Swiss-Prot record:
InterPro entries: Acetolactate_synth/TF_NikR_C, ACT-like_dom_sf, Arc_rbn_hlx_hlx, CopG, CopG/NikR_regulator, Ni_resp_reg_NikR, Ribbon_hlx_hlx, TF_NikR_Ni-bd_C
UniProt KW DNA-binding keyword: yes
Gene Ontology annotations of biological process type: response to nickel cation
Cofactor details (free text): Binds 1 nickel ion per subunit.
Top-level taxon in the UniProt lineage: Bacteria
UniProtKB keywords: DNA-binding, Metal-binding, Nickel, Transcription, Transcription regulation
Residue sites binding Ni(2+) per the record: H88, H99, H101, C107
Name of the protein described by the UniProt record: Putative nickel-responsive regulator
Protein function: Transcriptional regulator.
Organism: Helicobacter pylori (strain P12)
HAMAP family: NikR
One GO molecular-function entry: DNA-binding transcription factor activity
Similarity comment: family membership: Belongs to the transcriptional regulatory CopG/NikR family.
Length: 148
């Protein structure tokens, strides 16, 4: 199988599935509004590629991108400053933050990060472990290239 095809054309290939797996695939297509099986399969492959890219343990690979979503009690004493200190002290590049007031007690902050997977995940654990943090979820992405 030639995996280094430089042509941007779409390649057709077939996949053999058990009927119950195909039924589940078709249900997901309908549920999520995909226009075809191919669209869903492409998304699943992209997700797996990102997951595998994050699993590669290369401390010099700074191509990882992630969004950390944090919900916290803004009345918690010095929490905001501790979150900022952790961001400044980490080996991760903080590219952007967005802060919104959810209600009179809770804030939501998104932090866009770039760096190696270890440093990004460590930052998530440090912030997530702070007293007053109610939710800290990391959405992983990668800047590796694939053709559409």
């Amino acid at each position: 199988m030639d995996t280094h095809n430089k042509d941007d054309s779409i390649i057709r290939f077939s996949v053999s599935l058990q009927q119950n797996l195909l039924d589940e695939l078709d249900n997901r297509i309908i549920k999520n509004g995909y226009s075809s099986r191919s669209e869903l399969v492409r998304d699943l492959i992209r997700e797996k590629l990102v997951e595998d890219n994050w699993a590669e343990d290369n401390p010099n690979d700074e191509s990882k991108i992630a969004v950390l979503v944090v919900i916290y009690d803004h009345h918690q004493r010095e929490l905001n400053q501790r979150m900022i200190d952790i961001q400044h002290a980490s080996g991760t590049h903080v590219l952007c933050t967005t802060h919104i007031h959810m209600d009179e007690h809770n804030c939501l902050e998104t932090i866009i990060l770039q760096g190696n997977s270890f440093e990004i995940q460590r930052l998530q654990l440090e912030i997530g472990g702070l007293r007053g943090v109610k939710f800290a979820k990391l959405t992983k992405a990668s800047s590796f290239e694939y053709n559409e």
